[in-house]
Amino acid sequence: TLVSLKFERLLSMPHYTLGTQKVTIEALKGDIEVELRAYLSFDTLHESLNENFWECPVHKVSENSLQIMGVSKGTHQHLSATCIFDDTGIPTKSLAPNSKEISLVFRKTIKEKGAYALTRIASIDKIEADDASDRIMKAAMQGLSQYSFNQLLAANKAWWENQWEVSDIQIDGDDENQQGIRFCIFQMHQTLHTADHTAVIGAKGLTGEAYNGNTFWDTEVYCLPFYLFNNPEAARSILDFRYNTLPEARERAKALDLKGAFYPIATISGKECCDLWQHANLQLQASTGVMYGIWLYDLLTGDAAYLFDKGAEMLIEISRMLSSRGAYNTRTGEFGFYCVMGPDEFQMMVNQNAYTNFMAQKTFRYTLALLSRMRNEVPDQYQSLVNRLALLEEELENWMQMADKMILLFDEHTKLFEQHEGYFNLPITKLEDIPVEEFPLYSHWAYDRIYRNSMLKQPDVLMFMLLFNSDFSKAVLEANYEFYEPRCIHESSLSPSVHSILAAQLGKEIDAYNFFGFATRMDLDNYNRNTREGLHTTSIAGSWMNIVYGFGGLRSDGALLALSPSIPSAWNSYTFNLNYKGTLIKIHVDQEKVTLCATNPLKLRLYQLEIELDQTAKSYLIERA
């Protein structure tokens, strides 16, 4: 007997709750008897905890359909799973009251040279707890009947073709990174591609249970730029999640004896999920990261309605939190933050962390600018917001004063920002003196030993110098890069991309390419030996930034988009696109020139030159930093 088995399956991108499977069995030699068993199952174990977290109160089985509803034990979230088949089978004979698995059995005789195909169309969707599950599940069943495998396949193909037209990055001369960056782009689209205000981007995306699906402060910093230039609707959903969890952020602030809203450092539902107080209580970058996300969304979309409807409220509450978390120095009268932890988690309970203070100052000033804009452009909406939040003029005056008096430890002579008070006095441990077997330090050193050194886990000063790049001269950027880069051990997968981007800006081609070396293939090649736990989603987003913001030299923090492309000597050329306010910009870079065009007339800055693009491709000589 010789048998051919063909398995086809897909998860629909345009219809994001749908999936389909098709099994084709062909009897190549001899007659065969086959039995196929198709399941819907919630009988899965959390890998690290070895525990099942589902209850299944609803089951429905017919000769050509299955339905089951799962309710998560801890958070009581409802998930409906429904599927229909294009053939009739034998239902599960008996079910326990809370069975987590249902099935249909299909038995067939296939004659030699004959074939049998079984197709399933499935829907998996969230249900609000107070919705009528019977009504929702019945509607799901009726909805599935309008689709076929071929329809879903064709729609999926069209969706991906459209996405690659916008999102593709092409590298000539580096097949490994060509494959790697396309893998990264594919994963970013799979992770989030629709306007779902309840969606979060977990540290592992949808690919693993590590970090329990929680999103972290770096979502707005690393992931949002990708979506803003490739899928603005998905970008807005990231901010929607923060707006819809504003009540939880307010409760978190109260728990920390603060005003306003304190966004959690790790969350899946809006509530703080980090059980390490030194991270959960001391890190303010989740809140200032929300500010950065709103600011960048405003800058790159011009969506004033969203800003006025939702952004302003979040900014007011974040500013209230920062004003109550910070304090004035009794000796100098300057304002700053005490007992905090910045992005570099190797330094705890520090005073005047540079990133924290800088981002807080930006938050105060952006909030004030937005409220002034609302007062002029939408006075009625502004007054309604003021009344609803009981916003006082005195608060605005205080925020202005706090921003003006913010402590920023900058030395005009050395052009260095001190990462925090006393950082320059910390003992220096040379990285080459640490035995290889002691890495990662988090797993091999006592916490207090880590805190007693000037080593960095990931960039802190360099982080805000990337986010607000146009605020800093090349001399200041170079001084800080030269000082902090040798002290960073990159124990976060997010760290190399920041250094690569800034190295490219400074003309440090070897540094830029070396830091880029692991970016696109971290999970494909399992560099960190932990891909089995899930993909490094924010690092994958950083890989896209590494090419577009790094070698492409994109800067999106000014009035105009700015490009300063460079190219690794190992590459012949590369091409990427930017979807900016409805205009598609195409950028091609080779070893001699930069060629650009746009679907609509658009001004941008190329190196030091302001140019206007249109549909006709224009070429300019590449400039070496």
Regions found by a protein language model. Name each.
Residues 167-199, 203, 357, 382-423:
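Gly/Pro-rich turn-and-neighbor structural signature
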Residues 1-4, 473-478, 485, 502-625:
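Non-catalytic C-terminal accessory modules of carbohydrate-active enzymes
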